[in-house]
Amino acid sequence: MEKMGLNEIRSKFLEFFESKGHYVANSYSLVPNNDKSLLLINSGMAPLKNYFSGVEVPPSVRMCTSQKCIRTGDIENVGITARHATFFEMMGNFSFGDYFKRESIKWGWEFVTEWLNIPEDKIWVTVYEEDDDSYDIWAKEMNFPEERMVRLGKDDNFWEIGTGPCGPCSEIYFDRGEEYGCDNPDCKPGCDCDRYLEFWNHVFTQFDRDEEGNYSLLENKNIDTGMGLERMGCIMQGVDTIFEVDTIKSILEAVEKLTGVKYGENPKNDISIRIITDHIRAVTFLVSDGVLPSNEGRGYVLRRLLRRAARHGKLLGVKELFLQKLIDEVIKVNDKAYPVLVEKESYIKKVVGIEEEKFNETIDQGTEILNSYIEVLKNEGKTVLSGQEAFKLYDTYGFPIDLTKEILEEEHLSVDEEAFNEEMEKQKERARNARGNMDGESWKEDPLSKLESTVDSTFNGYSEIYGEGTIEAIVKDDELVQSAEEGDKVSIVLDNTTFYPEGGGQVGDCGLITNENLVLEVLNTKKGANNSIKHIGIIKSGRISNGDKVKTLVDRETRMSAARNHSATHLLHKALREVLGEHVNQAGSLVTPERLRFDITHFEAISNEELKVIEEKVNNVILSSLDIKCDIMNIKEAKEKGATALFGEKYGDEVRVVSMGDYSTELCGGTHLTNTSQVGMFKILSEGGVAAGVRRIEAITGKAVYEYLKERDGIISEVCVNLKSKEDNLIQRISSLLEENKNLSKELHDMKAKMSLQSVDSIFDSKVEVNGVNLITNKFEGMDMDTLRETADNLRDKLGSGVVVLANVVDDKVNFVVTATKDVLDKGIHSGNIVREVAKIAGGKGGGRPNMAQAGASDVSKVDQALSYASEVIKTQVK
């Protein structure tokens, strides 16, 4: 058996199945396309789900891929063992109602024995215990020795996820030899030992499982196979773990070189090296597919991986930023299969560098805080960190909860995850609407997928808003029906339509569908299963039936307004790249008739001056009256023309290219104007951050700009009246009022400072001594926080040595401030711990540094009791 590298194995696999009539698809993005049910692509078939369910028509009934995948379900084991990984590639061949078991098994055997040259006597196979067809194909048609065939039960050899498509599977194993086995003389696949390594699963999707657990035969049977590239690399290179496989080993060696730590000499260091090696692969591919670090969703997965790798670099003694440097090696070993990595190299490095730098700024302080929590837990004989403290580490210092758990586990401690999650939910409630469920895969079918034949709705609306068509399908109450009547809410499918379906960030068209017996108000238009276009609306009068001839009329005003905003997004995109840099990519958009929203990848706020330049550029192009042209061409020609593609989007062989003179060229399927002058005018309304590394611009065009300027003019007139100023003198009048306010504020601050010093003199004599430490406590009412902190500082300075604990009651709330001199810190005093315990008495919480801390509470009746408790806390700290 000849050794093969990962890149060669991948190439051979795709070449083999191409020779068998398969369409070779490039790996899909790790970000699912139009699938909110899945966070990240985690299997070879995941991006093909709509082909299996019939929602979309595949480019061929035979396909093969080598698909990038991410799984983080067992991330805590990555690095701890040499088997687990978060990033991997899954090679697979697929049939959508074409070939079935015979061809799948036959070609699998041919590839393994003739293309990979794996010795036949090293191969074992398993089949589902009730699948006689597969068994006979292996035994009788392939002449495979029955002594190396094993029948296994449902848990091992039957694939299903709840209800829906499912079926038996046949797995191919490699016999690694007796030295990997157990003492069982009957050892074979199905045993838990390491001898038999499963490397290729062939799933025969032939059944449909209902909610009662009954199985019925599918009309169109499918094939879904999966072969882990890295696992096959272990077999072909004769190594035990993926970290010894050529391309991954190369990255591991780069980690060794950067850290100066040798792999294989220290088990603890080996864990860190494996974690960094695995995670930098995942991070590189995630960023290349447009994922950015954030605190939720797939962005959180990226942040978690990146920060975990960064921490383990520190454990290996790395002090500077280093993850960026490892990206070079990841790209080097993957550049042939994934040229996009080369194209996005500088962008990937920038994203990773910024995130690592952010984490470096807080990790030392966060680690110090966590270590102090750990010390308190051990001193008090406790083993569980509170959820509130874990959340503070997450919210203030950027510690993902998983990282906190990992550090605690190293000390044989744990965290109250339930309480942490409660704190997280509170924050989400405060900061944003709860986001939808993104866990797991949904197999809910579009009713249109039940149609016996494909409905190819043809869109004729790029240049026309009027048209004619025939009703091909009617959906009412999520069921296909033959007819519908006045008042019914329906979705109808036409063979031809001028209604644009929602897509590319642009909302769907609205309007009317009519004939002599019908008026249907279309409220929205969307893409449906089987290449259909769904017209969603209400029957205002009459009735409809399948086969009826109808006329389509798109609302001209809303179509034109949406086209203005869509064309403007192209001009905006180009202007943003000119002003901010080529790293800018579209990260999302929303085009409605009322306004446009455009998200971009950029790593800092866009200044007002930059926004002015961007806005001016767009308006200059509008005034230049450039022709807008839309052409269909192959993807290669489009790229040669310099067309900008949507980051991470999957395109077919033919694409639609929208050109605006020589200024902007983009791939786009939306509706557009014919000349830039039709935009009228462009105005940016706002700019802000929506996630780490993502900025959002909202803007308006055309008549909306006129209405906006008219409203602003009215506001300015009203301000002039209220300030008794003329418009040309308004700025000067406002500046004068601000200066007056500034002087009054300074007078107020000086007065409060004077009162604070007077308070110090009257309070100082109340000091007491606790275990050799001077302590001053006092309660104020109606004082602002700045003055309270200033008073505490003045008391501490006058005290010279000791602790100051102050409380301030405002309305029904109380604030605590604790400060301590440097010398008492050496005696064990910790202001953060004091304020936390004191605040608890009054129903509050807080914390901070050893020398300074503050807290808030709600029970004002317990303030005196809380202040008195400060002396008890000090007694426990000073031994």
Swiss-Prot record:
Provide the residue span(s) of the region labelled Disordered.
426-449
- UniProt-annotated binding residues for Zn(2+): H566, H570, C668, H672
Q: Which UniProt keywords apply?
A: Aminoacyl-tRNA synthetase, ATP-binding, Cytoplasm, Ligase, Metal-binding, Nucleotide-binding, Protein biosynthesis, RNA-binding, tRNA-binding, Zinc
Asked whether the UniProt record includes Plastid among its keywords, one would answer: no
Q: Name one GO biological process term.
A: alanyl-tRNA aminoacylation
Family, similarity comment:
Belongs to the class-II aminoacyl-tRNA synthetase family.
Keyword presence, RNA-binding: yes
Reactions mediated catalytically: tRNA(Ala) + L-alanine + ATP = L-alanyl-tRNA(Ala) + AMP + diphosphate
Predominant location: cytoplasm
Q: PROSITE patterns given for it?
A: AA_TRNA_LIGASE_II_ALA (PS50860)
Under Gene3D superfamilies, the record lists:
2.40.30.130, 3.10.310.40, 3.30.54.20, 6.10.250.550, Bira Bifunctional Protein, Domain 2 (3.30.930.10), Threonyl-trna Synthetase, Chain A, domain 2 (3.30.980.10)
Protein name per Swiss-Prot or TrEMBL: Alanine--tRNA ligase
Q: Which NCBIfam families match?
A: alaS (TIGR00344)
Q: Which cofactor does it need?
A: Zn(2+)
Q: Where in the cell is it found?
A: Cytoplasm
